[in-house]
């Protein structure tokens, strides 16, 4: 185990535990002007507990559902990429994330809610989020609400939350809880994909949640002959997954043309994954690799996995483990791609140009000309991008010319 990283993780976990109130999901009775609402479906393998908490970190005996509506404070009261946690209960909707609805529902009610939501959503797309290690139920709910709001993607939000203890000392329990939840996640994905109104499904997994996502999709492919065709995009954010296991899981899903498009978000300065690497005896974690180094460069190219390297992007968290959600540029980039029904590295619409814009914004925030490194297939810098890249480079310094490069 990396003993230099462990104290950081323990302190971070303790700070979160000490500052998190009980009952933050209890709906408030009054709203505030200028707020926006995120209405989500929740599917969980957690055990039901008292109403103020809704679901605990224990494992439930069956799949449960909830419908939760989160109120997001006005833009003037918050920073994109951050969750404004209540300082006391009830929270203040003018400045903090609060719920206006939090109902436990049964499966027929969940499917009915989903059918209504899909049919009133433009282009009828769905976004499924799978959280990572050390997440309480309320952590997962409010973080997903932040992602959905800040990404501004017109998609039906579905949270799949598995039994995490919400403790840095429960790593083994959390890991086995992802295995425990595979069948349930597969059932949820099958239900969503079988709705005839759904056009496509994207999956966004974070940290340890990537293990659950990959193993579930692998299991689905083996059971059904392929991953459900409506599952188009899988976004792997800071995956706490062994590199070899990830490669085998994707391979087992079948040929590239019969499996989803995968986008991998990595950061070589991720301290949480450094901790995980120590626990697993030094095995490389997928979310912390150098995509330009062998054998990863060749393996990723062979698998057709797109890579976004966030190593030089400064994060809001001390562990550099949530850059995908805390960086305004990245979370909005994800939202635009999902809104347009394309992969995060689709070159046909000049995505390279948009990423240079993201780089410019990140560079300004970080005070460096190379605020963000992006590694992606060479096709990302398409003709449309090349025609406009010069202006962006001039805006942030010549050094940015090296930050968008072929992988």
Task: Mark where each language-model region is.
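Bacterial N-terminal signal peptides that target proteins for export
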Residues: 1-7
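Lipolytic serine-hydrolase domain surface
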Residues: 23-103, 112-113, 118-121, 141-157, ...
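Alpha/beta-hydrolase fold active-site loops
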Residues: 125
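The conserved beta1-alpha1 loop
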Residues: 128-132, 206, 238
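Short substrate-entry loop that stabilizes the transition state in hydrolases
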Residues: 136-140
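Gly/Ala-rich beta-loop-alpha elbow adjacent to hydrolase catalytic centers
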Residues: 185, 205, 209, 213
């Amino acid at each position: 185990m990396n003993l230099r990283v462990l104290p950081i993780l323990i302190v971070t976990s303790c700070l979160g535990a000490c500052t998190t109130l009980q009952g933050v999901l209890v709906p408030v009775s009054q709203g505030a002007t200028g707020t926006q609402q995120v209405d989500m479906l929740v599917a969980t393998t957690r055990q039901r507990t008292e109403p103020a908490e809704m679901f605990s970190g224990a494992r439930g005996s069956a799949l449960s559902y909830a419908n939760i509506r989160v109120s997001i404070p006005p833009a003037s009261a918050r920073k994109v990429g951050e969750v404004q946690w209540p300082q006391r209960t009830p929270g203040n909707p003018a400045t903090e994330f609060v719920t206006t609805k939090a109902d436990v529902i049964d499966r027929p009610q969940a499917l009915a809610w989903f059918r209504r939501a899909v049919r009133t959503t433009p282009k009828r797309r769905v976004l499924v989020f799978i959280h990572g290690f050390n997440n309480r139920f309320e952590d997962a709910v409010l973080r997903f609400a932040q992602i959905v709001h800040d990404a501004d993607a017109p998609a039906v939000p579905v949270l799949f939350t598995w039994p995490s203890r919400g403790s840095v000392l429960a790593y083994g329990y959390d890991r086995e809880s992802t295995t425990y939840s595979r069948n349930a996640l597969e059932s949820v994905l099958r239900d969503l994909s079988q709705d005839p109104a759904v056009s496509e499904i994207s999956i966004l997994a974070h940290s340890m949640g990537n293990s659950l996502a990959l193993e579930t999709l692998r299991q689905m492919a083996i059971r059904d002959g392929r991953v459900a065709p409506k599952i188009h995009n899988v976004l792997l954010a800071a995956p706490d997954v062994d590199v070899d296991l990830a490669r085998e899981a994707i391979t087992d899903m079948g040929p590239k043309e019969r499996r989803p498009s995968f986008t991998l978000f990595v950061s070589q300065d991720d301290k949480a994954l450094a901790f995980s690497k120590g626990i697993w005896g030094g095995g490389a974690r997928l979310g912390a690799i150098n995509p330009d180094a062998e054998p990863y460069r060749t393996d990723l190219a062979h698998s057709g996995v797109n890579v976004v390297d966030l190593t030089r992007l400064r994060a809001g968290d001390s562990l550099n483990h949530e850059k995908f959600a805390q960086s305004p540029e990245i979370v909005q980039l994800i939202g635009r791609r999902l809104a347009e029904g394309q992969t995060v590295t689709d070159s046909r619409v000049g995505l390279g140009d948009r990423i240079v814009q993201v780089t410019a914004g990140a560079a300004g925030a970080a005070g460096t000309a190379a605020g963000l490194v992006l590694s992606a297939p060479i096709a990302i810098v398409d003709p449309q991008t090349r025609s406009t890249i010069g202006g962006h480079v001039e805006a942030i310094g010549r050094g940015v010319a090296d930050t968008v490069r072929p992988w």
